[in-house]
Amino acid sequence: ETRPDDLDADKVKWLDEHPDFNLNTERENAARVAQAMKDEGWLFASHTWGHQNVSQISLERLQADTQKFKENVDPLIGGTDIIIFAFGTDLTTQEDYSGDKFEYLKSVGYNYYCNVDSSKYFVQIRDRYFRQGRRNLDVL
């Protein structure tokens, strides 16, 4: 496969040092692992392509990031309608979702929206979405 033009120097170096690496083979193997996990009841979610802080990035950056996830990860996991936001952030601090970012994420198929932080969890069920705060169980 032709190397993308946007590879940084570290990736180019790694690929040069591993001439046996085959992206298509790696993708096929990853898809098999994902399917085996799904067969056991696992669900997959987006955490964004680039671990983005959705409350701080522009709509355009969110769209570009989401497109990368949809093109590169969805084919491996069979798609998902769940997004778990990075950095304990959320789309809004308002009680109900609205706005361009929500409408965009909804338009590309997301129905379940979760943040991850150390505050008390919550659940919000609306006609157009399910929103849940989730407890961060990472150990620092």
Where are these regions (language model features)?
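Active-site beta->alpha N-cap acidic-glycine motif
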Residues: 1-40, 75, 79, 91
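A sequence-composition feature that detects small, non-aromatic residues
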Residues: 9, 30-36, 45, 64, ...
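Second-shell loop/turn segments in exported
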Residues: 22-23, 51-60
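Sequence-level motif detector for i,i+2 pairs with an aromatic at +2
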Residues: 39-44, 127
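Histidine-centered catalytic micro-motifs
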Residues: 43-51
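C-terminal active-site subregion of NodB/CE4 polysaccharide deacetylases
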Residues: 56-140
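Generic detector of bulky aromatic hydrophobic side chains
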Residues: 27-28, 34, 42, 69, ...
